[in-house]
């Protein structure tokens, strides 16, 4: 079962702000979140039924610091199309 704690943040980039005008928000989550799980979270905690949910996996970059390789964490992004009358201002998790 998906939980509200699996949602890390709402992304605020130039592209995501342009999509917000069309009613689409971009949500960053843990890699284990699924489309159906995200829909359940939106229904349960926000009282909103998303019209459409698209997902995208982003692999973490491999970075070097003083000769030691490290890896940034993997994440998953969701593009959530909301109904016209629904709005989510911020997500305080």
From Swiss-Prot:
Pfam families, alphabetized: Ribosomal_L23
InterPro entries linked: Nucleotide-bd_a/b_plait_sf, Ribosomal_uL23-like, Ribosomal_uL23/eL15/eS24_sf
The UniProt record lists the keyword DNA repair: no
Coiled-coil residue spans: none
Single GO term (MF): rRNA binding
Reported function: One of the early assembly proteins it binds 23S rRNA. One of the proteins that surrounds the polypeptide exit tunnel on the outside of the ribosome. Forms the main docking site for trigger factor binding to the ribosome.
Name of the protein in question: Large ribosomal subunit protein uL23
Source species of the chain: Sulfurovum sp. (strain NBC37-1)
Taxonomic classification: Bacteria, Pseudomonadati, Campylobacterota, Epsilonproteobacteria, Campylobacterales
Gene: rplW
């Amino acid at each position: 079962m998906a939980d509200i704690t699996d949602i890390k943040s709402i992304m605020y980039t130039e592209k995501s702000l342009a999509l917000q005008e069309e009613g689409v928000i971009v949500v960053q989550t843990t890699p284990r979140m699924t489309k159906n799980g995200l829909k359940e979270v939106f229904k349960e905690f926000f009282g909103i039924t998303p019209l459409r949910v698209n997902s995208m996996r982003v692999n973490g970059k491999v970075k070097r610091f003083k000769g030691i390789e490290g890896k940034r964490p993997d994440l998953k992004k969701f593009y959530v199309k909301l109904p016209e009358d629904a709005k989510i201002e911020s997500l305080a998790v």
